[in-house]
């Protein structure tokens, strides 16, 4: 029996113990299962209280049962839900009973959503939106994912594809029946006008999106600098907890440490790196190499110095902006009575990174200003990302492919070639929606879902 012909079940709520556990069932044997466990089928989409029993008639739990006959259900199949008390023993008894039915099995990760996709309840962009919603860490990520789940891109792509197919039909009618006198002499002009308008809409969407797809992964900020300048202390201040070991001994941090922050709803990953210096220690050398590599990939570099140090960030090979952060200002200023920032400017001249910040990572002085600046940088970096319809590189690539073919079709080509261009553009939008050649994308996407979703 094919996997899609089997009835599946899974825990769709949090892991036990919990107040309530929800077990979802989807497939053709759903009605038989509900009747066997609860005695009868509930009225569709109405909650029914029932003492559910196992195959031997032994009570499992006093539960609430819901019944959603297909195709008017989340998956398009018959769906049942058992709302039980969330104890481990109760859940285990229900799961064991469900497993005892023929052609009924535990669901794979993302299998409920995949069945919803296969039955046309959602398209691929909406499934991706659901995946993003499940994994959203910040409010802006949540809002972006919810828009995608509700068809922000999918609805537009479906409309564009329908219009392309209509234009293609006009052109092919002109080709096929040109000698029969059954169609107007010139069907190409209105079709090309439609194509030009569509190309303009797709081009405008691509131009306006900015970094909307980056909102899923977040902004990367690397803390870089010489050893023992307080990088780990600054990391702990930003995280508001101890995530990195702080020691007075240089070279304590040997590997890259990451912490994920929520700055006004923007996801930011801060990286604490090994101190950059020449060393004979092979382990420390590897730490320095990794620090330089991660700094090169960062969207923003914080070059951290102790307040009395003079050192340019020459070791960083990155096109990202570099901000100077002078740490330990409480110690340096009090001990020397001088202004180290002036010394830095005198020695480095125009090479001083801007903007610059003076902080005490140990005491917390200046941290609020730095965090505020990071939040402003994130807002500018992402722009209106949360409202963007393009949330994955796959979306951008396929929209570009469709746009290229639409633009080709406008260049005075023969009608047969124009029809083929439109066929290619339609295929790209079909792949975007999950209607054409996307099996590898589906496998990768639904593996990322949790079991029960």
UniProtKB/Swiss-Prot annotation:
> What biological-process GO terms show up in the record?
tRNA methylation; tRNA wobble uridine modification
What would be one Gene Ontology cellular-component term for the protein?
Answer: cytoplasm
Q: What class of enzyme is it?
A: hydrolase
Question: Entry's PROSITE patterns?
Answer: G_TRME (PS51709)
Q: How is the cofactor bound?
A: Binds 1 potassium ion per subunit.
Instruction: Quote one Gene Ontology molecular function term.
Output: GTPase activity
Which InterPro entries did the record assign? G_TrmE (IPR031168), GTP-bd (IPR006073), GTP-bd_TrmE_N (IPR018948), GTPase_MnmE (IPR004520), MnmE_dom2 (IPR027368), MnmE_helical (IPR025867), P-loop_NTPase (IPR027417), Small_GTP-bd (IPR005225)
Ligand binding (GTP): 228-233, 247-253, 272-275
The places in or outside the cell where this protein is found are: Cytoplasm
Q: What is its main location?
A: cytoplasm
SUPFAM superfamilies per the UniProt record, alphabetical:
P-loop containing nucleoside triphosphate hydrolases
Q: What positions does the entry give for Mg(2+) binding? A: 232, 253
CDD domains for the chain: trmE, TrmE_N
State the UniProt keywords alphabetically.
Cytoplasm, GTP-binding, Hydrolase, Magnesium, Metal-binding, Nucleotide-binding, Potassium, tRNA processing
Where is the TrmE-type G domain positioned along the sequence?
A: 218-379
Q: What does this protein do?
A: Exhibits a very high intrinsic GTPase hydrolysis rate. Involved in the addition of a carboxymethylaminomethyl (cmnm) group at the wobble position (U34) of certain tRNAs, forming tRNA-cmnm(5)s(2)U34.
| Similarity field | Belongs to the TRAFAC class TrmE-Era-EngA-EngB-Septin-like GTPase superfamily. TrmE GTPase family.
Q: PANTHER family in the record, alphabetically?
A: TRNA MODIFICATION GTPASE GTPBP3, TRNA MODIFICATION GTPASE GTPBP3, MITOCHONDRIAL
Q: How does it assemble?
A: Homodimer. Heterotetramer of two MnmE and two MnmG subunits.
Name of protein: tRNA modification GTPase MnmE
Q: Which gene encodes it?
A: mnmE
């Amino acid at each position: 029996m094919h996997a899609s012909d089997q009835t599946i079940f899974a825990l769709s709520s949090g892991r036990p113990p919990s107040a309530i556990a929800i077990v979802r069932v989807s497939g053709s044997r759903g009605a038989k299962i509900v009747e066997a466990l609860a005695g009868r089928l509930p009225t569709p989409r109405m909650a029914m209280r029932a003492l559910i029993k196992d195959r031997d008639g032994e009570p499992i739990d006093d539960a609430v049962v819901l019944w959603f006959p297909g195709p008017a259900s989340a998956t398009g199949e018959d769906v049942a839900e058992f709302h039980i008390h969330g104890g481990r023993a109760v859940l285990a008894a229900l799961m064991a009973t469900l497993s005892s039915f023929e052609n009924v099995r535990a669901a794979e990760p993302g299998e409920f959503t995949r069945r919803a996709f296969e039955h046309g309840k959602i398209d691929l962009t909406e499934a991706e939106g659901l995946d993003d919603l499940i994994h959203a860490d910040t409010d802006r990520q949540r809002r972006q994912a919810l828009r995608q789940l509700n068809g922000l891109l999918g609805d537009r792509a479906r409309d564009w594809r329908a219009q392309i197919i209509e234009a293609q039909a006009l052109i092919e009618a002109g080709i096929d029946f040109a000698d029969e006198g059954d169609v107007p002499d010139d069907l190409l002009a209105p079709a090309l006008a439609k194509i030009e308008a569509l190309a303009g809409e797709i081009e405008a969407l691509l131009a306006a999106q900015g970094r909307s797809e980056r909102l899923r992964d977040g902004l990367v900020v690397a803390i870089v600098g010489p050893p023992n300048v307080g990088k780990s202390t600054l990391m702990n201040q930003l995280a508001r907890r101890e995530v990195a070991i702080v020691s007075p001994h240089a070279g304590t941090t040997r590997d890259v440490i990451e912490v994920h922050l929520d700055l006004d709803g923007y996801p930011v990953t801060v990286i604490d790196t090994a101190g950059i210096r020449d060393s004979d220690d092979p382990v420390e050398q590897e730490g320095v190499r990794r620090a330089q590599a991660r700094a090169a990939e960062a969207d923003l570099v914080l070059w951290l110095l102790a307040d009395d140090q003079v050192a340019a960030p020459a070791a960083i090979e990155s096109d990202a902006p570099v901000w100077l952060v002078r740490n330990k200002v409480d110690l340096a200023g009090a001990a020397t009575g001088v202004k180290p920032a002036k010394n830095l400017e005198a020695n480095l001249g125009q090479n001083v990174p801007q903007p610059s910040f003076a902080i005490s990572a140990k005491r917390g002085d200046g941290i609020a200003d730095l965090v505020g600046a990071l939040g402003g940088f994130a807002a500018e970096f992402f722009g209106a990302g949360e409202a963007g319809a393009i949330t994955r590189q796959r979306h951008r690539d396929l929209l570009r492919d469709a746009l290229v073919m639409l633009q080709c079709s406008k260049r005075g080509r023969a009608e047969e070639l124009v029809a083929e261009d439109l066929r290619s553009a339609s295929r790209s939008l079909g792949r975007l929606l999950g209607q054409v050649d996307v099996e590898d994308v589906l496998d990768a996407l639904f593996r990322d879902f949790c079991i029960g979703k």
